[in-house]
Amino acid sequence: MPLVVSTHRIPEDIEVLLISGGVRNDEDVYNLQRAVKNVKRVIAVGTCAISGGVTNLGDRDEVRELFRTQAKRYHLPQLLNKTHPVDSFVDVDLYLPGCPPTPELFMAALMDPQGFKASANVCGECGRRKLNDMKPDHITGFEKGSPDPEICLVNQGFLCVGTSTRGGCRAPCTRAGHPCVGCRGPSNAFIERESAVWFENIQRVFERMTNIPPEELNQALRSPQLSMFLFQFSDYAGGDRRIRSKDKVL
């Protein structure tokens, strides 16, 4: 038996099944439920499998209507009412968030998820200094050029949400000068709480560290730059599903 196989046809007696991608149509549901029958452990890999990711951007009326009118004509799979996480249809043993998860996280998920050590949030792995006397008045981002490599990106006017995002990725984005967009999902401090609590915490961080007007901040936090990942916070809170235990999220 090969070590790694990419297929919808799952052989018998498989130790671990890695599932990536959201569940968007009835064919996805069929393949997913069929695949998990012959495996011992299921790992949901990446933002799409856990919360829909990029495909959730297609959950708009005009997109659904287009597929409904053309699906029967071209014998296409039927769209579901929205993009669903994997655990809407099957049980998941471990969640591996990230867009994408790093090689280190993949190794930990396969070899020793309980023994993996990570900081509480991305800020704990970033290494940049937070300054009390440097408070930007507006979100400027790269308008002022490349950021100072030593100073916190929030202090420099970047929309960075590393304070509330779970660690483990080793902060490659912020170390390279790009703000964290939250692709790893909420840190353990918020993972079993309502999504409104996480959003309010992000707002408080910016209120404490910046002089950015509340209206500008609220608009920025709901912008396309962040919405693709921040919307996933509500999926961790459960909604009509069971709340995801932080012990099952790497």
Where are the regions that the model predicts?
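Short gly/pro/ser/thr-enriched loop/turn and capping motifs at secondary-structure boundaries
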Residues: 48-53
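Active-site-proximal loop->helix
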Residues: 56-57
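Thiamine diphosphate
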Residues: 21-31
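Iron-sulfur (Fe-S) cluster-binding modules
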Residues: 1-18, 33-41, 66-95, 100-250
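Short, hinge-like loop/turn segments at secondary-structure boundaries
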Residues: 60-63
